[in-house]
Amino acid sequence: VTTRPGEQLDFLDSVYSPKLTRGFSIVVRRMFRKQFASVHAVKGSLDVIRSLDRRLGPAIIALNHSSWWDPLVCVLLGTSEIPSRTHMAPMDIAQLRRFKFMRKIGIFGVSPDDPRSLPRMTRHVIERFGREPMCTLWITPQGEFRDVRDEIVLRPGAGAVAARACEKREIPVLALAIEYTFWEDKRPEVLLRVQRVQPPDLNDHATRSERIEAWTGEIERAMRENQSSLAQLVMERDPRPFEILLGGKEGANHPLYDLWLRLRGKHGRIRARKAEKAAASLSQKGVSPAPIGGEPS
């Protein structure tokens, strides 16, 4: 709800607890093992995430927002791949008041419909970055649930934080793409891809609004490229470009179904298409997967 002029801005700070976050991550891992066949990441993606654990300084990870599971993916990645870092993420304050325990895993509440929330959120994140040099901001800059097939269009939140945080030093900004899809298991797969966001080319005289616009554009471009590259791999239904983060064991289907497949000389896992066919398909569509590291190919 938009506040009236003179009304105090509604904001709810987090009270981050590393101990509770680690405990909650155990619950999250069990949830993923129960509800999904596996969690896979495109090869090289986890290396990009893990590099943050070896770097002193804050970081920003911007992800698409298509599911209730998205923040739990962040918990899974944050606790398993970058355990030395602390974490924070914005959330609609009305929802956070319903799930107050989430404040202890780094969630803070903002009023998304109040334009004053943007500078307040930016100020809060920068202050936290100053207090905690290994802090990571996870943010869904689309600002609402959107289907993975929709073109990614961003609100300025992530760009505003990146522009402010990078005024005096360069910090890593990553794009995380997530898809939930069914292949051949009775349960869905979680598929991930990570790509670096290249800093915009800005001169020393750029205004703050120009910096925000430039950063928003670069994050949006990287997220679109990343989502498109992941979508191509999802449609190919080939597990070879992926590495397993969680689950992914053979024989995940029903035992009788697995037996039937073995009798037919097949197996329960996704059969990889020939690499030549995949490459030809991408070439015909004029699609070149974006590099994981974000460097020019």
Give the role of each language-model region.
Residues 2-16, 119-297:
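Non-catalytic C-terminal accessory region of glycerolipid acyltransferases
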Residues 27-65:
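Helix-to-loop junction immediately C-terminal to a conserved catalytic motif
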Residues 33-36, 84, 102-104, 168:
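Short, well-ordered coil/turn elements that cap or connect secondary structure elements
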Residues 9-30:
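Helix-enriched interaction subdomains in cytosolic or periplasmic regions
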Residues 3, 10, 53-115:
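Catalytic core of membrane glycerolipid acyltransferases/transacylases, capturing the structured
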